[in-house]
Amino acid sequence: FDAYCDHLLVRDAEGRLILADALTRASEEKPELVIDMATLTGAARVAVGPDLPALFARRDETAEALLRAGKINDDPCWRLPLHEAYGEWLKSDIADTNNAHANAFAGASVAALFLDKFVGKDIDWAHFDTFAWRPAGKPGRPKGGDALGLRAAWHMLRERFG
């Protein structure tokens, strides 16, 4: 990751550049696992609604552990694909990658594929694309800001690392 040139194709997707820097920095430490949580796209919210954060994971075991932990803690998540073919949409003629794509398809998956480029290939990685805002309250979950996915991640981390 010493020199990576990004084409800022979509100015409204600049936050993922900051997260890419953080993921690059985290990868330098060679951790076993990196989990990031961000309000990255509106596309994830459209896809899964207000009760579920979109979950992306490189490894099925990690995704399954997070989904299971979400069920146990009443903090459900929904896995969306890191479909490699969509990575073609991030290709740039003038840089190593684009920060987004110009079409209207698979916005959350393409954003996650962008982030995937900045995590060391040998590192297990999961990404929650969460809007973290609940438009209406329900028992145990008030209206307003909500840490969607946090309970699931915490439970999985405790199980995995003690």
What does each model-found stretch correspond to?
Residues F1-G162:
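A generic structural signal for tightly packed, nonpolar segments enriched in small/aliphatic residues
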